[in-house]
């Protein structure tokens, strides 16, 4: 093999290793809900999915993965984080359940976030019983605005 061909082959192998190392695994997204995870029927809730900058699509999934909503309106929150928002304008008991997020950032899809459980309960109406619990989050890292997420 000629010295030039050997050098070229070595360069290609080094570049391939560098590209493979840079791709790595995508960080897991995080999921949270506002105003909280315990919601009264008829109230609204917004799920926030967060991931790194460069996300093209966020996906909010129900526990069985058959129901999902994609959002392409990804907002940049800062130099390293982006977010998508998914709204349910009038929550019903059918919306209760486990939700999680994932995102698409070329060249592929991230892992799923941890599950977040949405509970739909009637308010007791007492002054010491708030309609919702404070915001809750699950998962580890980093969207947009999309319309409602239908009950199954």
From Swiss-Prot:
Region (Disordered): 120-152
The Ig-like C2-type domain, residue ranges: 29-117
Pfam family, one: Ig_2
Keywords on record: Disulfide bond, Immunoglobulin domain, Receptor, Secreted, Signal
Signal peptide positions on this chain: 1-21
GO cellular component: extracellular region; plasma membrane
Localization of this protein: Secreted
Gene3D superfamilies assigned: Immunoglobulins
A GO biological-process term: immune response-regulating signaling pathway
Disulfide bonds: 49-101
SMART domains from the UniProt entry: IG
Descriptive protein name: Leukocyte-associated immunoglobulin-like receptor 2
